[in-house]
Amino acid sequence: MRTDGHPVADPMNIVFAVDRGYLRQVAVTIRSIVENCSTPESIRFYIVHAEDEAFVAEAIAEWSVSGVTPVRVANDYGTVGGQTHVSKAAFIKSMLPEALSHLDRAIYLDADIILLGDARQLWEVDLKGAAMAGVVDLGVYIQMIRGITLGDFRRRDCQIMLGLDPEKLEYVNSGMMLMDLNQLRAMGFSERFRQTDETYRGRLIFVDQDIINSLLRGRMMLLDSRWNVHSTLMSRHLARRYHYLPDSLRGDLALQQSEQWAIHYTGGRKPWNSSEVWSGEKWWRYAELSGMDWPRPTAAKWSIAQAISEGWFDVASRLSAFRYNLRKVKSG
């Protein structure tokens, strides 16, 4: 019992899977979680990694938070050939059920996420028998439908190859997942992940995310879209392509635009390497509280050529939207 007479909340497990390139960023994510959680004293953080143990322990010692447990695994997955947006560390996600064999349930987060909502509310979501829960990846559907419109069927065909139905609009982003670890162990998730990777290696687009969606087909619960809002989706670039988003997902986009419970800094531009990231200042708020020394990137200077390019992209996007909507009217 707490000294104020209120019962202590059930322990809450939050997990990260990183390499040394993203280890420092975990401190910022953790600080955002602690600052916005109604029961911060109940959180147990785990960092699953394949790095030198002394290096990780030394890094964690600098952080302004406690209750962080490093767990080392052997990551013998090969490099992700040709997939610059996917690191080898992404495969550590597949090892979580076995690496954390003493846990029944966990929230998994990528290290380029900040939590603005109460993690306790996410933790207490009823999975209703599902083995995992995540947020539909709106960006994937925008890019897939745009690709189909332009004659590029790779994203659609990748889903079909894995036994997924692109029409169901249930493909989730693997950067934030609520996991029933008992169910994942029971289904042999880690070994089946490895087998699927061996079968399709070099043929997948989002690799670990593709495999997770394939293995959890029919066992994945969809969460409120505000739990995983992508910075790239809110950027000027992708905003000009919203017309490709299926009508049934537009309500999810509206929710994300109105409120964010978690911001996921997707894409190559991150708050720590670019001053032109949507809601980047929110990340910096928690960076300043993390105990880490973060140098801010300098503001980019726009050239005339960039302004012209941006203007042309805007015109081209408007024309694209007009043609796409006209095609929908004719086909309807």
PLM feature spans:
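Active-site-proximal specificity loops/subdomain of glycosyltransferases
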Residues: 55-99
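GT-A fold catalytic core of metal-dependent nucleotide-sugar glycosyltransferases
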Residues: 74, 89-150, 178-179, 185-186
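Short, charged/polar "capping" segments at the starts of alpha-helices
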Residues: 51-58, 142-143
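A glycosyltransferase accessory/donor-loop signature
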Residues: 1-12, 18, 174, 179-332
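Short internal beta-strands
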Residues: 43-51, 134-136
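Active-site beta-to-alpha loop of glycosyltransferases that engages the nucleotide-sugar donor
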Residues: 18-24
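Short, acidic, metal-binding catalytic loop of nucleotide-sugar glycosyltransferases
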Residues: 32-41
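Short, flexible, basic/aromatic active-site loop/helix in glycosyltransferases
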Residues: 153-168
